Amino acid sequence: MPDCPFCLLEKPRILLENDFAAAISDRFPVAPGHTLVIPKQHVASLFDLPQEEQSALWRLVALVRDKLKIEIAADGFTVGVNDGLAAGQTVMHAHVHVIPRRNGDVADPRGGVRWIIPDKARYWTEGHA
């Protein structure tokens, strides 16, 4: 797609790649090392990829995690996908966010991705069982 920022990635931006996916640094990182893993085929949803391409994408996610664990000594990772407008997807080319985390980067990391709906995030507290 000519207007898609992920369809025509410039080679210098690519950190890692395989036959079906490429990894690049996020241009608006929420943490140092925030990386996007993007299928080379233009699809809006990861679920529209053939199984072989989904598998290759997730293998690349694992390689990115391994690389970041060594390079920036991440203590953990938040890995996520915004699939569809209702989920917050702003670039309609599927991609996976790999966000390195450090102990102490937020006051209380419990709940992780549950914070997308703040009223549901503190499931471990009384009254949320």
What are these regions (language model features)?
Residues M1-A129:
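HIT superfamily nucleotide-processing domains
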